Amino acid sequence: MELIINLSYYHVADDVPETDSDIAVVIDVLRATTTISWALKNGADSIQVFSDLDLLKDTAKKWDGNKRLMLAERGGKTIDGFDLGNSPLSVTKETVQGKRLFMSTTNGTKSLKKVQNVEYLFAMSLPNRKAVAKRIISLNKKNVLILGSGWEGSYSLEDSLAAGALAYYIKENYNSEVNILNDELQASLALWNVWKNDILELSLIHISEPTRPY
């Protein structure tokens, strides 16, 4: 028997109330969860995220230097002393295959840590939205929390677009009722419905605005 799925979305980690969600989906399109998705696709063994850089370093040192990579970014820039930043272009198959990645970013890792204790946790970006949606449907769980990462505590257009894309795909493909629980997700779903055929155009308009580093 398929359960009713309840979907909610919050823009940033600080907005999330106490929750009994079965599933959490964290989105940081620019760029943590996009990088995580590509790294795993390219053969990374696993990825561990940290808010604290010193803890990241101490943990990474316990691993064979040939089988680990340290990734860290603050304010859109790679931090000195780390192997990589948070660009998806850097996590090539040749670079990450078979390695454990230790990662810290300005926004995405904060959201991942916020919901780390849920039963099922997904890192989603636009390219893997359908795969995440299919997996959520197959799990047949009731409460799904979608969490954006924003930019330094503020709203992110691209995260909300991705949240809307996820909700749209679940609604279109789930054989039972899907409840949209809050205005944040209703707005994100509307955003996706307007722009789903012109994602590139929206991205170019958004990135052309010099509001933050990419």
Describe the predicted segments one by one.
Residues F50-I137:
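Acidic/Gly/His-enriched mid-domain segments of enzyme catalytic cores or analogous surface patches
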Residues Y174-S203:
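Flexible, glycine/charged-enriched surface loops at secondary-structure junctions
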Residues P127, S138, Y155-Y169, Y174:
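Glycine- and Gly-Pro-enriched alpha-helical subdomains that act as flexible
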Residues A13-D14, A24-W38:
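Short acidic, Gly/Ser-rich segments with clustered Asp/Glu that frequently serve as metal-coordination loops
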Residues H206-Y214:
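Single conserved hydrophobic/aromatic residue that forms the stacking wall/gate
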Residues I5-N6, D22-V25, D45-Q48, K67-M70, ...:
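Structural motif
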Residues M1-L3:
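N- or domain-start disorder-to-order transition segments that initiate the globular core
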Residues T35-N42, T59:
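Short active-site loop/helix that positions an aromatic residue
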